Amino acid sequence: MKFFRSVGEVFGYSPFRSLAQHARMCGRAVGLLQQQFEALRRGNYEEVEELREEIDELEHHADQIKEEIRGNVTKSLMLPVDRHDLLEFLKVQDDILNNCEHVGHMVTFRKVSAPEDVWDEFLVLLSKLMEIVNNYEEMVERIMQLVETSFSKKEVNRALEYVPIIEQLEHECDLIQIGLHTKLFNLENSNPLDIQLMVTWVVHLGYVANAAARASDRFRIMILGR
């Protein structure tokens, strides 16, 4: 006879608390990227490198949590959501951190010179990214209330209210990216290598926003597919 365990019977282990902790790290990573770009603007490359190391450490810690969840969410563990949906959600959420790490490395490749209005636009983009991940974190934090209330309709609706907000913010992020690309491609007195690298930054910052939007959709699938 197949033996099933409840979530609370695995030495108190809860994949949902770990999922929420992993989501908080996404917000922390975007916050570190903001600091990196502020340091870039000031030309403080030592701080840029230190922040890259912080992002690397954060991503490594997040990977440990990810592997902990994968190792504990076995087929014999009884869950209130579909196991495959939970692991797919975790995979996409992890893309937020992976893309933050990529950007954190790319800004150390070269000392870039850019006009002040370009740095202004990068910080506007990062501010919008921070808004996205703040809403994303709040959404994932709701998962504990969902579990505690046995996924009551009221709590499900409250949690899923964040999904269209995140999607709208991701669209606004796209518009900022378009404006920033236009500005970069019209720089006449800048080094072409600097422009090329900054364009790559814009693209990968967009990947962070896209990952958050995709993860919010996977969250919705996980909650509604139970």
Curated annotation (Swiss-Prot):
Family to which this protein belongs: Belongs to the UPF0111 family.
Protein name per Swiss-Prot or TrEMBL: UPF0111 protein AF_1799
Organism field: Archaeoglobus fulgidus (strain ATCC 49558 / DSM 4304 / JCM 9628 / NBRC 100126 / VC-16)
Organism classification: Archaea, Methanobacteriati, Methanobacteriota, Archaeoglobi, Archaeoglobales
Pfam families attached to this UniProt entry: PhoU_div
Domain of life of the native organism: Archaea
